């Protein structure tokens, strides 16, 4: 199901993001602790004329992991090579990428948790010693040779750090977690994007869009484009708070940034499972959605905003969820209660 507030990138998102992507850290809005730390690391690295330590960036989709990698490369004054874990199928694919790097270049691997074990084995010495071992020939005549690599920086991005192997995770000297954005930072991003795209958007209109963007710049920019469409057809082209609210009503995105799937999830837990706890498999089956979709796309924002909690026994709707759905909380067994205490 296509969702207007899905944080996964569409082709339209990717095309637009290239045009509005900031180049410098000064233009990278939000994520202040990350910006401040990376600014120090980059300045120190340039002063020493070294390659920046390898960087792992993780967090939910749409928060700017790819954008941050472009900014880092730009600030370092080096080239960025972009690829993804699923694309690197064989050790030879990775070797080809690494041997074509220039000194101090940045190699960005998105979805790095999806690298195969064979490819990871090649990556370890490349990260540690700037060397790779490759096999020449076949059968009894096969032999291993070492190839020296120029100093480089690997930036890995992932939405699922739990799927990274410990040896790979431990080889990153810099680890940055991207958090959901505040409405204020998102409003600044909306205003900046509107200026670049020549969209007439008031401060109040930008704030209304930001409030419903689930803390995610990609969603904020997508909503901005859809509200622009509405403003051009149903209004005079300017995005005011009234126009933004009317457009959101048409898109069925409420003030909390929830769409029908979010509301269905909360309603299902509340109405069919008495508020929980309920296991993720049962929940996915009830909603006819994949477990991974719920865990990676839907739940993170609901949990971060306090509408849902994960416990050892399953998911539970909070009192805040009941309030959002205009329902009265029910008496329910605590997820932390010892079953023997019930008798």
From Swiss-Prot:
Region (Head domain (RuvB-H)): 255-343
Gene Ontology BP terms: DNA recombination; DNA repair
Region named Small ATPAse domain (RuvB-S): 182-252
Region (Large ATPase domain (RuvB-L)): 1-181
Main subcellular location: cytoplasm
Binding site for DNA: 291, 310, 315
Location relative to the cell: Cytoplasm
Keyword set, alphabetical order: ATP-binding, Cytoplasm, DNA damage, DNA recombination, DNA repair, DNA-binding, Hydrolase, Nucleotide-binding
Chemical reaction(s) catalysed: ATP + H2O = ADP + phosphate + H(+)
Enzyme Commission (EC) number: 3.6.4.-
InterPro entries per the UniProt record, alphabetical: AAA+_ATPase, AAA_lid_4, DNA_helicase_Holl-junc_RuvB, P-loop_NTPase, RuvB-like_N, RuvB_C, WH-like_DNA-bd_sf, WH_DNA-bd_sf
Gene Ontology CC entries for this record: cytoplasm; Holliday junction resolvase complex
Molecular function terms from GO: ATP binding; ATP hydrolysis activity; four-way junction DNA binding; four-way junction helicase activity
Pfam families assigned: AAA_lid_4 (PF17864), RuvB_C (PF05491), RuvB_N (PF05496)
Residues annotated to bind ATP: 20-21, 62, 65-67, 128-130, 171, 181, 218
Annotated Gene3D superfamilies: 1.10.8.60, P-loop containing nucleotide triphosphate hydrolases, Winged helix-like DNA-binding domain superfamily/Winged helix DNA-binding domain
Keyword Thylakoid carried by entry: no
Residues reported in the UniProt entry to bind Mg(2+): 66
Subunit architecture: Homohexamer. Forms an RuvA(8)-RuvB(12)-Holliday junction (HJ) complex. HJ DNA is sandwiched between 2 RuvA tetramers; dsDNA enters through RuvA and exits via RuvB. An RuvB hexamer assembles on each DNA strand where it exits the tetramer. Each RuvB hexamer is contacted by two RuvA subunits (via domain III) on 2 adjacent RuvB subunits; this complex drives branch migration. In the full resolvosome a probable DNA-RuvA(4)-RuvB(12)-RuvC(2) complex forms which resolves the HJ.
Biological function: The RuvA-RuvB-RuvC complex processes Holliday junction (HJ) DNA during genetic recombination and DNA repair, while the RuvA-RuvB complex plays an important role in the rescue of blocked DNA replication forks via replication fork reversal (RFR). RuvA specifically binds to HJ cruciform DNA, conferring on it an open structure. The RuvB hexamer acts as an ATP-dependent pump, pulling dsDNA into and through the RuvAB complex. RuvB forms 2 homohexamers on either side of HJ DNA bound by 1 or 2 RuvA tetramers; 4 subunits per hexamer contact DNA at a time.
Domain comment, as recorded: Has 3 domains, the large (RuvB-L) and small ATPase (RuvB-S) domains and the C-terminal head (RuvB-H) domain. The head domain binds DNA, while the ATPase domains jointly bind ATP, ADP or are empty depending on the state of the subunit in the translocation cycle. During a single DNA translocation step the structure of each domain remains the same, but their relative positions change.
Family: Belongs to the RuvB family.
UniProt protein name: Holliday junction branch migration complex subunit RuvB
Organism classification: Bacteria, Pseudomonadati, Pseudomonadota, Gammaproteobacteria, Lysobacterales
Gene: ruvB
């Amino acid at each position: 199901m296509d969702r207007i507030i899905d944080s996964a990138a569409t082709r339209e998102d990717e095309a637009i993001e290239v045009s509005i992507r900031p180049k410098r850290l000064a233009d990278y809005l939000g994520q202040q602790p990350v910006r401040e730390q990376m600014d120090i690391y980059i300045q120190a690295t340039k002063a020493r004329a070294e390659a920046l330590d390898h960087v792992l960036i993780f967090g939910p989709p749409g928060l700017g992991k790819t954008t941050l990698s472009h900014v880092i490369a730009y600030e370092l004054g080096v080239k960025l090579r972009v690829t993804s874990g699923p694309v690197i199928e064989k050790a030879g694919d990775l070797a080809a990428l690494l041997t074509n790097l220039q000194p101090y270049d940045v190699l960005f691997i998105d979805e790095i948790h999806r690298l195969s074990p064979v490819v990871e084995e090649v990556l370890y010495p490349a990260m540690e010693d700037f060397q790779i071992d490759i096999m020449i020939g076949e059968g009894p005549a096969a032999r291993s040779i070492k190839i020296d690599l120029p100093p480089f920086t690997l930036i890995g991005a992932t939405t699922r750090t739990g799927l990274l192997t410990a040896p790979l995770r431990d080889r990153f000297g810099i680890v940055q977690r991207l958090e959901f954005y505040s409405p204020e930072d998102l409003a600044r991003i909306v205003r900046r994007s509107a200026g670049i795209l020549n969209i007439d958007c008031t401060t109040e209109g930008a704030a209304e869009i930001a409030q419903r963007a689930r803390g995610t710049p990609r969603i904020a920019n997508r909503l901005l484009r859809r509200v622009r469409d509405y403003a051009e057809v149903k209004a005079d082209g300017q995005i005011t708070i009234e126009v933004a609210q009317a457009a959101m009503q048409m898109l069925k995105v409420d003030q909390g940034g929830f769409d029908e799937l979010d509301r269905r999830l909360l309603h299902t837990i509340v109405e069919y499972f008495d508020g929980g706890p309920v296991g993720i498999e049962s929940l996915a089956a009830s909603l006819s959605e994949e477990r991974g979709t719920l865990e990676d796309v839907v739940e993170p924002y609901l949990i971060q905003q306090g509408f849902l909690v994960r416990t050892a026994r399953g998911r539970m709707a909070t009192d805040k969820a009941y309030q959002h759905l205009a329902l009265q909380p029910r008496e329910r067994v605590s997820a932390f209660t010892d079953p023997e205490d019930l008798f």
